[in-house]
């Protein structure tokens, strides 16, 4: 298991059913963290490392701000996106100056090639070996990561609140998002728990395998 310590100046990790007020989770869901790790290593196929375990923890108590912004909608297919009724103002919550830890464990990845865990380590230690494009974000493309540090043993630099699986937990976060509809979206139930060391591997949410695999 390895981890990354990250700082993100501005982000919104949108709650799945947020509508008029676009509320944010206090930390990025496993699906968002998985996407960010794929981006770091330059992987464009999100199926590539299914089966790994990923989660996040928050090191501080970031401020939550509310802003007014324009969101695109699909009310009228005859009108261009972002125009007329296909755009409307909404309030959005933003997480300000978040300090995070993102864990990754690849021992359950079925693919025999280089694991996501190993690729993350290589990307941090040998950035010139990675081919990628664009900024590195944790969520929307504007939610850029400012600082990143490898924690090779997975131990956080200080106590943090981590999202860990728990059958009786009160928090449900996506581990896989269906970007076409909602049918294929998968969730994990857990809770935020204070950790001082690398968490138990089996309590990290697992990115689900494709149907029929494994």
UniProtKB/Swiss-Prot annotation:
GO terms for biological process: defense response to virus; sporulation resulting in formation of a cellular spore. Disruption phenotype: Essential for sporulation, decreases sporulation 100 to 1000-fold. Negative autoregulation by this gene product relies on DNA both upstream and downstream of the operon's promoter. The keyword Cytoplasm does not apply. InterPro entries: Cas5_Cmx5_DevS (IPR013415), CRISPR-assoc_prot_Cas5_N (IPR013422). Induction: Part of an operon going from at least MXAN_7266 to MXAN_7259 that includes a CRISPR operon with transcription continuing into the pre-crRNA locus. Belongs to the CRISPR-associated protein Cas5 family. NCBIfam families: cas5_cmx5_devS, CRISPR_cas5. The keyword Ion transport does not apply. Keywords: Antiviral defense, Fruiting body, Sporulation. CRISPR (clustered regularly interspaced short palindromic repeat) is an adaptive immune system that provides protection against mobile genetic elements (viruses, transposable elements and conjugative plasmids). CRISPR clusters contain spacers, sequences complementary to antecedent mobile elements, and target invading nucleic acids. CRISPR clusters are transcribed and processed into CRISPR RNA (crRNA). Has a role in fruiting body development, sporulation and aggregation. It comes from Myxococcus xanthus (strain DK1622). Signal peptide: none annotated. This is CRISPR-associated protein Cas5. It comes from the Bacteria. CDD domains: Cas5_I-C.
């Amino acid at each position: 298991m390895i981890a990354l310590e990250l700082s993100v100046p501005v982000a919104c990790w949108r709650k799945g059913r947020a509508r008029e007020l676009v509320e944010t989770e206090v930390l990025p869901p496993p699906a968002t963290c998985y996407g960010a790790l794929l981006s770091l290593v330059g992987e464009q196929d999100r199926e590539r490392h299914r089966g790994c375990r990923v989660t996040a923890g928050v090191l501080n108590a970031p401020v939550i701000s509310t802003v007014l912004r324009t969101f695109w909608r699909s009310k009228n297919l005859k009108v261009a996106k972002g125009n007329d009724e296909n755009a409307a103002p909404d309030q959005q919550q933003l997480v300000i100056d978040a300090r995070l830890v993102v864990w990754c464990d690849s021992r359950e990845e079925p693919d025999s090639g280089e694991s996501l865990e190993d690729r993350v380590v290589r990307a941090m230690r040998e950035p010139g070996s990675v081919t990628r494009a664009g900024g590195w974000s944790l969520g929307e493309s504007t939610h850029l990561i400012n600082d990143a540090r490898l924690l090779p043993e997975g131990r956080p630099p200080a106590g943090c609140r981590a999202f860990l699986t728990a059958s009786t937990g009160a928090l449900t976060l996506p581990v896989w998002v269906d970007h076409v509809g909602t049918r294929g979206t998968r969730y994990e139930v857990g809770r935020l728990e204070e950790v001082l060391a690398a968490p138990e591997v089996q309590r990290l949410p697992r990115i689900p395998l494709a149907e029929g695999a494994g």
